[in-house]
Amino acid sequence: MADTTDFKNGLVLKIDNKLQQIVEFQHVKPGKGPAFVRTKLKDVVSGKVTDKTFNAGVKVETANVDRRDMTYLYNDGQNYVVMDDKTYEQYELPFDKFGDAGKFLLENMRVQVSFHDGEALFGELPISVDLKVEHTEPGLQGDRSNGGTKPATLETGAEIQVPLFIETGNTLKIDTRTGEYLSRVNN
């Protein structure tokens, strides 16, 4: 059981016999009336996101989730294959288990996979990863028609928007939660 003061992003709750992961939450204390917590919950099975409001101080059942450190091995065309770092056991996770962040997976990358009752719920990448730019067009000085950014293809095949000064071969730090460029990494 968890109190609403224990809420944090990533916490998995058991609501109506469904596992719901907190994606976003906000404590609200209105001028009149009791405080409450507004949340966005993602169903870990279907991926559906819903809004739910809890009164402050309410106890909510948490799911017993086991997070394991794993290494991403490869993509077999239908699944991401990961290996448990302790037991060397391999697991096949469907693409949707990593969500949009899956496009930033590189072989031998360290990831965390959450399990409940022996079943893999979802995988998480580090908050930021360093990836090399495979291709980008040269940026034209003074070109501000698209906000000072241009598309770049990364070594994983993902395409993101980067500043005009980025060149092919640069290594970039990417936020895996949003898919945004953070900085250029010195080689």
Curated annotation (Swiss-Prot):
It comes from the Bacteria. Its main location: cytoplasm. One of its GO terms (biological process) is peptide biosynthetic process. PROSITE patterns: EFP. Belongs to the elongation factor P family. Involved in peptide bond synthesis. Stimulates efficient translation and peptide-bond synthesis on native or reconstituted 70S ribosomes in vitro. Probably functions indirectly by altering the affinity of the ribosome for aminoacyl-tRNA, thus increasing their reactivity as acceptors for peptidyl transferase. This is Elongation factor P. It comes from Corynebacterium aurimucosum (strain ATCC 700975 / DSM 44827 / CIP 107346 / CN-1) (Corynebacterium nigricans).
